[in-house]
């Protein structure tokens, strides 16, 4: 089918698609690329039909430019006047039209992802952006203006702040904790183990006496009286709480785990002959003995305590 002449269309709609009209305008230019305004001008000058209802067909033409791979967008150089980018034909779409006729198109041109021109296109765009950045920097240097500081850009660097959260580790460590008796936590002498030595018990006793005067009497914390830990199952922790180990026996290889127990009331100092008396009176202290039941049910009066010292000792042992 021969191509119709230019003067045969007059006011009728030409039989060309928007892709054909755009390709015709680009190939007819000297530089083989045109801005969008020049493409509009070429079509309206060549075909009078498109001089009316310009907004409708121009929207359709822009849609074809953006969604067809046969057209590529070229940014305008800084030295070129005007605004907007240029549009050109893809180098590999030369045979898109059969026999050079814009009336018959072979098939829709599609650029594959593995196209070898894609890396060069990306590199050209990067080079163009670098050139624009250099031009802007030179313009700023010539005008004497300064660039904004780097902190304004979102580079992940936050300025240092002097504000510290009240629950920060520095604030927690810096706090001065007070004990119930008014003794500061920092003045307490920590013990190296759950079982203190003989020379350490006096220091612990002094701290306990100042921390809990209502729980321990002065006679129990007498530093002159030696305290033997050989036959005792109880110990004193660093905070003055009596503890008892879970593991018993001298042959235990595992370290003893201190278990806090409930502190008892203040007791007077016991004489040295009490263990002998308690060992002799062990049958009377049996839970099944009627004497024990009688002593627990009827407390001794102050007169009985003064006249019968063994009753007082028995009540202390039962307690």
Curated annotation (Swiss-Prot):
GO cellular component terms given for this protein: nucleus
InterPro entries from the UniProt entry: Fork_head_dom, FOX_domain-containing, FOXB1_B2_FH, TF_fork_head_CS_1, TF_fork_head_CS_2, WH-like_DNA-bd_sf, WH_DNA-bd_sf
Region (Disordered): 278-310
Keyword Aminoacyl-tRNA synthetase: no
GO molecular function: DNA binding; DNA-binding transcription factor activity; DNA-binding transcription factor activity, RNA polymerase II-specific; RNA polymerase II cis-regulatory region sequence-specific DNA binding; sequence-specific DNA binding
Entry-linked SMART domains: FH
DNA-binding region: 13-107
Tissue specificity note: In early gastrulae, expressed in the inner layer of the posterior dorsal ectoderm and in non-involuted mesoderm. By the mid-gastrula stage, expressed solely in the posterior ectoderm. At the end of gastrulation, expressed in ectodermal regions fated to become diencephalon, midbrain and hindbrain, and weakly expressed in regions fated to become spinal cord and tailbud. At the neurula stage, expressed in the midbrain and posterior forebrain (diencephalon) but not in the more anterior forebrain (telencephalon). Also expressed posteriorly in rhombomere 5.
Biased composition (Low complexity): 279-305
Gene3D superfamilies (alphabetical): Winged helix-like DNA-binding domain superfamily/Winged helix DNA-binding domain
Keyword set, alphabetical order: Developmental protein, Differentiation, DNA-binding, Neurogenesis, Nucleus, Transcription, Transcription regulation
CDD domains assigned to the protein according to its UniProt record, in alphabetical order: FH_FOXB2
Family annotation (SUPFAM superfamilies): Winged helix' DNA-binding domain (SSF46785)
Record's note on what induces expression: By FGF signaling.
UniProt KW ATP-binding keyword: no
Subcellular location per the Swiss-Prot or TrEMBL entry: Nucleus
GO biological process: anatomical structure morphogenesis; axon target recognition; cell differentiation; cell migration in diencephalon; ectoderm development; floor plate development; hypothalamus cell migration; inferior colliculus development
Biological role: Probable transcription factor. May be involved in the early anteroposterior patterning of the neuroectoderm.
Name the record gives this protein: Forkhead box protein B1
Organism expressing this protein natively: Xenopus laevis (African clawed frog)
């Amino acid at each position: 089918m021969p191509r119709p002449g230019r003067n045969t269309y007059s006011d009728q709609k030409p039989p060309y698609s928007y892709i054909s009209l755009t390709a015709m305008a680009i190939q007819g230019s000297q530089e083989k690329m045109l801005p969008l305004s020049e493409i509009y001008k070429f079509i309206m000058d060549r075909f009078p039909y498109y001089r009316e209802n310009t907004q409708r067909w121009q929207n359709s033409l822009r849609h074809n430019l953006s969604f067809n791979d046969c057209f590529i967008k070229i940014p305008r150089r800084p030295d070129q006047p005007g605004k907007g980018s240029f549009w050109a034909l893809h180098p590999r779409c030369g045979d898109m039209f059969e026999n050079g006729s814009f009336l018959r198109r072979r098939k829709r041109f599609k650029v594959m992802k593995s196209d070898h021109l894609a890396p060069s296109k990306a590199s050209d765009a990067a080079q163009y952006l670098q050139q624009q950045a250099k031009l802007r920097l030179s313009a700023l240097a010539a005008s004497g203006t300064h660039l904004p500081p780097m902190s304004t850009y979102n580079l992940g660097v936050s300025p240092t702040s002097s504000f510290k959260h009240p629950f920060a580790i520095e604030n927690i460590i810096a706090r001065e904790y007070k004990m119930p008796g008014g003794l500061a936590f920092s003045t307490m002498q920590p013990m190296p183990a759950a079982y203190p030595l003989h020379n350490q018990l006096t220091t612990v006793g002094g701290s306990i006496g100042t921390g809990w005067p209502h729980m321990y009497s002065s006679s129990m914390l007498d530093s002159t009286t030696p305290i033997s830990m050989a036959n005792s199952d109880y110990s004193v922790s660093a905070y003055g709480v009596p503890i008892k180990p879970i593991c018993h026996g001298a042959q235990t290889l595992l370290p003893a785990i201190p278990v806090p127990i409930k502190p008892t009331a203040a007791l007077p100092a016991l004489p040295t002959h009490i263990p002998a008396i308690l060992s002799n009176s062990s049958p009377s202290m049996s839970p099944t003995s009627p004497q024990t039941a009688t002593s627990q049910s009827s407390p001794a009066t102050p007169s009985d305590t003064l006249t019968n010292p063994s009753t007082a000792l028995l009540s202390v042992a039962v307690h």
